[in-house]
Amino acid sequence: MKYIKRFENSLESIITTINYSNSRFYKLPKLPKTLISLDCVGNNLISLPKLPDGLENLYCSGNDLTSLPNLPDSLKKLTCNFNSITKLPKFPITLIELHFAGNGIIKFPDLPEGLEHLDCSSNKISHITKLPNSLKKLYCYKNNLTELPILPYTLEYLYCNHNNLEKLPKLPGALEYLICSNNELTSLPELPDGIQLLDCRNNNLIELPDLPDSLKKLTCDGNNLPYDDLDGYKYFKKYPEKYAAKKFNL
């Protein structure tokens, strides 16, 4: 069994960052009180030691964790992708970035109001509760979702592909990237003026909404769209060669 021994007393008072990534450790020692950032990605850990009160960044993806210890009130970034976690602890209000993709999460957790980046993809979530008003990036693909909640007006990235969605809520004006492929969508809501990328392939769409001039890439194959008459779409009529032929996957 590979593990690391406790730090010397002379080091405990000065260490702020530790990187144990891809070291095949089964166990970690007691962590220094001064620690701000811990990276233990890609080991064989089944548990973590008590986390220091001042810890701000925790990266523990790719282990065998089934749970996490209590999180310190100072934590800003948490990445625990691809473990075997089924229940998450309470999150501190300081948390800005949260990644727990590829676990066994069924119940969507309560989120801190200041959260800006959330990746909950590849879990077993069937319902998402209220999202923080500060959220900018949401990755919730490969779950069991049938609907989405009201989206915060700050949201810029939405990846909700590979679910069972039949419709989407109103899209926020800040949205730039919308990936909603491989669902059961029959229509799309009005697209925001600043959207740059739309991937809506493999749904049940029979028409597209008006496509804003800001759009740079559209992928919409695998639907029931009438491609025989692209002039029916104002966007393609306005940019018949520059976009339809070169940047759009039809």
List where the protein language model places each region.
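Asp/Glu-rich intrinsically disordered low-complexity tracts
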Residues: 33, 39, 44, 53, ...
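Short acidic, low-complexity intrinsically disordered linear motifs used
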Residues: 1-12, 241-250
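N-terminal segments that cap or nucleate solenoid repeat domains
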Residues: 6-43
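Leucine-rich solenoid repeat scaffolds
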Residues: 199-247
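Conserved hydrophobic beta-strand positions in leucine-rich repeat
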Residues: 18, 38-40, 58-60, 78-80, ...
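Canonical leucine-rich repeat
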Residues: 28-31, 48-51, 68-71, 88-91, ...
